[in-house]
Curated annotation (Swiss-Prot):
Gene3D superfamilies for the chain: Mitochondrial carrier domain
Annotated protein name in UniProt: Mitochondrial thiamine pyrophosphate carrier
Chain segments annotated as transmembrane: 19-39, 87-107, 122-142, 173-193, 220-240, 293-313
Similarity remark: Belongs to the mitochondrial carrier (TC 2.A.29) family.
Main location class: mitochondrion
Catalytic activity: thiamine phosphate(out) + thiamine diphosphate(in) = thiamine phosphate(in) + thiamine diphosphate(out)
UniProt cross-references to Pfam families, sorted A to Z: Mito_carr (PF00153)
Species in which this protein is naturally found: Macaca fascicularis
Length: 320
């Protein structure tokens, strides 16, 4: 299971093993879902409606956007910003899962609450994600800038991007969009962890005995379900975060349509509602849900997989 397990036969991995499992989980997952992330970011940053009826809209559907990006920018465009994204995923995965395991253990040892309860997983998952976000947010800003830029490129390399952004916008640029990120990530990650745990219990209750034997499939399906639920409920805040992160970067967005400036989170929400309507809060939701299902499913799948590998290694070593 994910989180502290007080049962005597529960996994007893070291903190280093937990961090490594989280890092590898993030690395593999990021490589697989990067194309969906690029499409999602392009949709979120487009001010025009995602519709064929709008002649100014550059993108209006997942398949159309995929074809257009492939034709205009080549296959590698789907992995734009992949290096900062991988740094983000490796660091984020390590800090998030390590924090979650430590927090749930702390709750078990220092309170009367059951570390496996929905509410405990929600709070610990949210706090773990906030800790990870504070650690890697500058890399997230870099990833968004790389994924958002068109042709010709504004930033050629990671080093060039860091230097240019620092000189032109100051050190605070690396924490743009932090407020909506923290506001969004707490309930999102909290729901990921708590829904994953609840769906696993539901799966065990609903499935016949034969179906319970395939634990890897269970982890993948429950993780995917948790990703869809959490992303749907918190999506508008993710859109605000992306819009704010590209502030000061408007010249590189000119090829994609309208460009707007926002004074902050509330101003961003107000402008989106006034100029794009309530549906504007959910631009890019379809590729985002697909990405959330795959990324969360793979995240928990690979994390549980590698934790089990380390557990088997530990047990074998202790028996020698």
């Amino acid at each position: 299971m994910v989180g502290y397990d007080p049962k005597p036969d529960g996994r007893n991995n070291t903190k280093l093993q937990v961090a490594v499992a989280g890092s590898v989980s993030g690395l593999v997952t990021r490589a697989l879902i990067s194309p969906f992330d690029v499409i999602k970011i392009r949709f979120q940053l487009q001010h025009e409606r995602l519709s064929r009826r709008d002649p100014n809209a550059k993108y209006h559907g997942i398949f159309q956007a995929s074809r257009q990006i492939l034709q205009e920018e080549g296959l590698t465009a789907f992995w734009k910003g992949h290096i900062p994204a991988q740094i983000l995923s490796i660091g984020y995965g390590a800090v998030q899962f390590l924090s979650f395991e430590m927090l749930t253990e702390l709750v078990h040892r220092g309170s009367v609450y059951d570390a496996r309860e929905f509410s405990v997983h929600f709070v610990c998952g949210g706090l773990a994600a906030c800790t990870a976000t504070l650690t890697v947010h500058p890399v997230d800003v870099l990833r968004t800038r790389f994924a958002a830029q068109g042709e010709p490129k504004v930033y050629n390399t990671l080093r060039h991007a860091v230097g240019t952004m620092y000189r032109s916008e100051g050190p605070q640029v690396f924490y743009k969009g932090l407020a909506p990120t923290l506001i969004a990530i707490f309930p999102y990650a909290g729901l990921q962890f708590s829904c994953y745990s609840s769906l696993k219990h539901l799966y065990k209750w609903a499935m016949p005995a034969e179906g319970k034997k395939n634990e890897n499939l269970q982890n993948l399906l429950c993780g995917s379900g948790a990703g869809v639920i959490s992303k749907t409920l918190t999506y508008p805040l993710d859109l605000f975060k992306k819009r704010l992160q590209v502030g000061g970067f408007e010249h590189a967005r000119a090829a994609f349509g309208q460009v707007r400036r926002y004074k902050g989170l509330m101003d961003c929400a107000k402008q989106v509602l006034q100029k794009e309507g309530a549906l504007g809060f959910f631009k890019g939701l379809s590729p985002s849900l697909l990405k959330a299902a795959l990324s969360t499913g793979f995240m928990f799948f690979w994390y549980e997989f590698f934790c089990n590998v380390f557990h088997c290694m530990n047990r074998t070593a202790s028996q020698r």
